[in-house]
A protein has these predicted regions:
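ABC ATPase C-loop
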Residues: 145-146
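Catalytic Walker B motif of ABC-type/P-loop ATPase nucleotide-binding domains
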Residues: 153-157
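The feature captures the beta-strand-to-loop junction immediately N-terminal to the Walker
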Residues: 36-38
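Helix-to-loop junction immediately C-terminal to a conserved catalytic motif
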Residues: 51
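Conserved ABC transporter NBD signature motif
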Residues: 59-66, 79, 109, 113-116, ...
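Helical segment within the ABC ATPase nucleotide-binding domain
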Residues: 168-181
Length: 238
């Protein structure tokens, strides 16, 4: 299967600080990658670098064969990079539906399809973003990213701070997205066990470099790897 996302020798960071000293990573269409690591290992920096909001010191990025290295974040979004940041960044002064129609691009992920996945959003379609609970805001952030009909979906700790019942609903939705095919996903998640059942590949970062890259079932069978790189088996730090 051809690579959908290709990162080659990426050196990136903030200001003069290099956080990623030379990242090389590829993802195939439909692949779901769980990105794990302790706090400060470069997970969010990698996500932000794909989005285009870090300083790039070197290296290249390609999406479906298209060189996006020098593209602005808005150009990358139109090219097919969907992003759900930790802060969610929904439009609080727009309604649920307006949040999605404002960015929607033609494709299989329509507003109505998002409503099928998140019935709660349909019930709140005329409510403003600032009237939603934290879980509803996260559903909206994911739904809005999907209506862009991205090729790559980036989710930075999508379940952080949410009630267990909402977490289960979100994980079920993420499973629906991955089964729909066509999109490759990178998910940063602080609880490894929570995400291993969803991902088919796991990458662990340490000091901005990949120290483990394997199928998720292999990591399940070797909890010592989680213990070694994350400190506590089954739990990944921010």
């Amino acid at each position: 299967m051809p690579d959908l996302l290709s990162i080659e020798g990426l050196r990136a960071g903030y200001g003069e600080a290099v956080v990623l000293p030379g990242m090389t990573l590829t993802l195939a269409e439909g692949q779901v990658l769980a990105l794990l690591g302790r706090n400060g290992t470069g997970k969010t920096t990698l996500i932000n670098s794909i989005v285009g909001i870090t300083r790039r010191f070197g290296g290249s990025l390609a999406l479906g064969g298209l060189d996006i290295t020098t593209m602005r974040p808005d150009q990358r979004a139109r090219a097919g990079i969907g992003w759900v940041p930790q802060e969610r960044n929904i439009f609080r002064s727009l309604t649920v539906e307006e949040n999605m129609t404002a960015v929607a691009q033609p494709g299989p992920w329509t507003v109505e399809k998002v409503y099928e996945m998140f019935p709660r959003l349909k019930e709140r379609r005329n409510n403003f973003g600032n009237q939603l609970s934290g879980g509803e805001q996260q559903m909206l952030a994911i739904g809005r990213a999907l209506t862009l009909n991205p090729k790559v979906l980036l989710l930075d700790e999508p379940t952080e701070g949410l009630a267990p019942i909402i977490v289960e609903e979100l994980l079920k939705a993420l499973g629906t997205i991955t089964r729909a095919g066509g999109i490759c996903s990178i998910i940063v998640e602080q609880n490894a066990q929570k995400i291993l059942g969803l991902a088919d590949r796991v990458v662990i970062l340490e000091r901005g470099a990949i120290v483990h890259d394997a199928a998720s079932h292999a990591l399940k069978a070797d909890p010592a790897v989680l213990e070694r790189y994350l400190g506590v088996a089954g739990a990944a730090a921010h």
